[in-house]
């Protein structure tokens, strides 16, 4: 496969990605087991007094709610040629699909990533989506969003513009930032109408546990200026690297939290790999996430056993052993 072609990116894809075949099998198994997609706003919401309040989810007996989320839905330059879609588009029927560039340079439109795959599945199985609610799409901004080059840096071309962006701009001399942003907003609007929610994954994929306050503030403003207008704003932050701003205790008094809260963020999600972790105060709703990827399936199938049997879904095209993290 193109993702597992032995280049320097192969190990990373093997560790932190899920193949289409795996994803489709997982979706079918979880549906068959009675899982139903809900969103964060189904679980808790800010009341008229500005306080976070728990809500009730009503499902038929035998059904289990879960939240689906996908990070980095930006179609980075670094992924070109690796068997990954290039952008999300709207087809002639008004459905959200992917554009994919084939080896000969021609483009095809189809369902090659989480959003259109779930959309097609829910068309056939509407009871998989509670009130039509689907997953959360977490966005960075440094290469733009949803495959559109929406960041201001593509227009201003600062001195520190990286080689990926320079090469893309050289190949697209007719680039127009306003057109890219308008197209991205059109797709984002269509996704929201289909039940998708957007979250910040930080503009620059920053590790929020280690980043300085100054960098955090700059990054947050970059997100607000470049992405919020396209997605209608968001009050959810899904931490890049899964790295939280503290080690599990309440956020109250945490300088980074106080700043993010002041910027309108009410929902915070890390990656802790537990079956579930929820923490709620008047000020925020916090939830852990589980990574369903090559690393977790290969090394810790037991940590996913309540969702699906890894032996039924693990893609034989994956090189094994899956490389350990940090080369360890």
Regions flagged by a language model, labelled:
Residues 1-38, 53-60, 64-68, 79-80, ...:
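C-terminal active-site subregion of NodB/CE4 polysaccharide deacetylases
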Residues 42, 203, 272-273:
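Proline- and acidic/polar-enriched loop/turn elements at helix boundaries
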Residues 1-6, 10, 50-52, 59-66, ...:
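Metal-dependent polysaccharide deacetylase catalytic core of the NodB/CE4 family, i.e.
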Residues 36-37, 43-51:
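Membrane/wall-proximal cationic-aromatic binding patches
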